[in-house]
Amino acid sequence: MIRHQNYGTDLDPQLSQYDIFKEYTGGYVKSISANKTIMDILSNIDWESNNLNVILSKVFGVNPGDSIEEIVEKVHSQVKQNYNNPASKSIYGREALYYKIIESPTQWLYKELTGIIEKSLFFHTFKGLSWNIFVGKSPRIRSLFLQNKLSQWLEDTNPVSEGSHKRRIAYDLDLPTNDDRIYHSSYRGTVCPIETPESGKIGIVLNYASGYRNTNKDTGYNIVALPPSLIPFLNKNDANRCLMGSNMLKQSLPLKKSKWSKVITENYINMYNYHWTNIKSPVAGVVTSVGTNRIRVKTGSGEEIPVEIYTNFSGNKKTNYTTVPKVKVGDRVEAGDILTESKFFKSGVYTPSTPLLAAYLPYNGYNFEDSIVISQRLVDEDILTSEWAETETLTFDKETLLPTQGFCDDYNISQDWVINSEVIKSKIGQTLHSGEPLFHYFRPVKLVDDFIVKTDNGYPQNLFSLVDIRAHYDDSRVDAIYLLQDNEILEITDENLNKCTSIVICTSGCHKVEEGDKLSGVHGNKGTVSKILPVDMMPRLPDGTPVDIVLNTMGIPSRMNVGQLFELSLGLCSETLRKRLEEYGDTDKGREYLRNLLVLLKEEIKPNHDLLDELIEDIDNGLVTKMVNTDVVFLMPQFQEITTSVVKLILRYLGLPEDSAAHLYLPEFDETTKRKVIYGYNTILKLEHMVKKKTKARCNGLNNPDPTFEEHRGQRSGEMEFWALESHHATATINEMLKYTSGNYQN
């Protein structure tokens, strides 16, 4: 039974959807059968297959020959089926939201189409109606499926943001109150209490909770959504910091060298099913060829099925989706087996970043107020180097003029700007610097009709303005250039260059970490890189190992995200245990060493007896798990109560300090810290807020960066920043900000 907050009446879920809508609105809604006359007219319209959205056929099963009635009915039934899924609990006010977003535009579409058909019948015969009356001056169908609130640009920065966006829900409230934002008790197990935006939409935009496998108790629902389920020791953190950690996970970039986290949850393994770049085999058979663009699988009947894979594919957020084949020629695969794996995954486990050796201590003011000090090793060895890919399309319209040989000869334009097939082929594979032009084209300047310019050879012409397509970042590599004509790829020739309708340029590259980039942990601990020190100047452990990153201790007590300290200590245990097992190898001594640790844990961790017994039995039978052969990872249940006594037990068994702390040596000051410093391994994410994306174009007056981040521009220093510096009498800084010395650019 469903209870509405305004009417207070019980509604039977088996009622007709129109009856429920009528109950909510108090109005009368006509059924589809009432418009049978209009639908008869629509059924006889000549539909063109290439005008239908391809997504409709894939998602809703819409065919090119379907009528308007069939299209709307299929979409209606599909959405209705998803909302009535028994696995999804009843959400407070969900039905009213559903009809406001889905049913209202549908009824509006019927009304609009009725007017269009009746008006068109005055000017056309019955057979003269075509699809153009819908996509011409009145694009009604397009506005329903492309401009509706449910039609959104997918956030695919990483698998977490993609999975979270697909599970997002929002209340359509014009003026939400505080009562609307409060987490209702009926949401538990259906809507996540943690993940929500930090903006004015807080509590209004929500996310469905995700299912998970609980080793302690079999339950049908999980309380948190997908991003919070990736935070180990979630119950050790303040909820506000968990919210920030969830949002940071959705902003992490794919790294060139990502590794397993030292401490993971169950959903790090389940994430494999959330990303579309993990391509599965459509049929069972034998792999016959593995290439850079496709994999071929030969079935039992002798047919070869090609499976396309992606190389330097650009997502909506310009992240690089490069898939790595996981099979080789001759392998036997079944339907559903993984063929390729994206860079977000290693052996089926989600790897958002790489664990770094971290130490918590104030360091000479460089990590004041959430600033971060990192080692030069992270730059030189590409540990925090992110990859990007970008696609630019130059579409030719009536005003776009490409400087071909004939065009340059007619209008006396420099031969340096000539573009032909040889020039295009020579640009493929080039590495460009930031601001270096890749293509030139011209647009005519609109002038008064009687104003004509005479060129040297006597031809009259209008004035042309030169437009450049330039590289946005350093070390931009041109991967491919395509000539397209009506979405068909043409061969790069001079003849095809004159008749193509667009040119597609694919570039890719890497971003090394630098001062000003934003880093974050999974527990909501975030900051910007303020100093990159040489490896010789980084603090050192007692055994001489330099740390990778130095964080400030003042960022923990007031934020109350203590889960990062548990992850820090267990990460140190994981790395130490890996080194011990690597030293012992697959010997009786190594198996005995691991078995004794599991026996100790069995006495301390009560609910996991069965799991630990299986591991001990495997070791007794001479089996070593696949994880131990490559790395040692602690798999933590989401809300498992791990006490400090358990962590101390593991540290003590491995011969490490119980407090996971030691006196560090500071080479910069040639002294040892007076107090112990806690150290270990934390997962550090590199976020999409990079400093090289923030400072781009500048205005003419104050030489400040222009706004509009989407146009490859950056942030500008406004009046309030100027006042703040003025109040501190920072004249030198103001001089740098407001004059030409604020950036390294010409003229």
Name each region found by the language model:
Residues 1-4, 9, 77-284, 288-747:
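Long insertion/accessory domains within large nucleic-acid-processing enzymes
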Residues 1-81, 89, 93:
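Intrinsically disordered, low-complexity, charge-biased terminal/linker regions in eukaryotic proteins
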